[in-house]
Amino acid sequence: MPLKTLLTGLFLSVMCLVPPALSQSAQNSRDELIALLGRLPEIAPIRNQLVAQGFQGEKLALAEAHSKRVMTDDLIAGYIADRLIALYDGRLSAASATEGLIAPLYESGITHLPVKELVYYHKVQRVLLDGMTPRDCGLLVKGQLRPARMEDVIGRAEARLSARTLKEFYRIQYKAMRLGVTRAPRQLSPAEAARIQTVIFEAVRKRVESASNAKALSNTLENFERARNATACEAAKIFAEAVLDITGRDQQKALLFLSAP
């Protein structure tokens, strides 16, 4: 995703720029970081990487505009500035700094989206898996892709989306990030989570049983991390499709379950 490249650039930039700022007042430090974020698309241009991932024409313009919109949003930039200050105060570990700058916004904000947008978001996430090789897809869903490789794989998959889909996907991402600044993740109660998990697993079971490779898929779901990449990818797609097919009063709860960090 383009934003992670920008944030990596930001992290490297503030290694030099933040310490002097922190010697001043906290508010001055925060204001300077927000200003730096606004200039980040110029300091750490990502156009070449986007082109290498397959973005071109309207889709390239959309990706660049999305990154700029996020970095120049005072609400989001203020949140990231606070995280950077926490990093230098020792309240945020450097090991998780670049991921931790913005990931919490997604994790929280997505859970506050209206059902229609939440459905759209997860449908696009499902389609992105089709834009990857079975190996990359399997490693991704098993959480075994190196960060740099994961960024590239997801970027290339996003570049395969239509411009119309990409535009709406970015709009929803931006909205989720703004929601995530001020709201904690919406969570199901333990009882609701247990009930909806049963509903989801039953839906997944029915889909798996109807597949030609039902036994392999069943074994994969029981021991996901050690499964073959291609089968893990297929199982992840089935799981996502089963959740997206749930309707009625359970729909939102199933989507919240799917959105849990």
Model-based region annotation:
Residues 19-23:
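Sec/Tat signal peptide C-region and signal peptidase I cleavage site
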Residues 50, 79, 143-157, 245-247, ...:
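Long, contiguous all-alpha helical interaction modules
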Residues 9-17:
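Bacterial N-terminal signal peptides
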Residues 12, 132-133, 229:
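Secretory pathway export signals and precursors
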Residues 201-261:
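A cross-kingdom marker for long, charged
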Residues 24-142:
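N-terminal Sec/ER secretory leader and immediately downstream segment
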Residues 1-7:
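Bacterial N-terminal signal peptides that target proteins for export
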Residues 120-221:
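Extended amphipathic alpha-helical interaction segments
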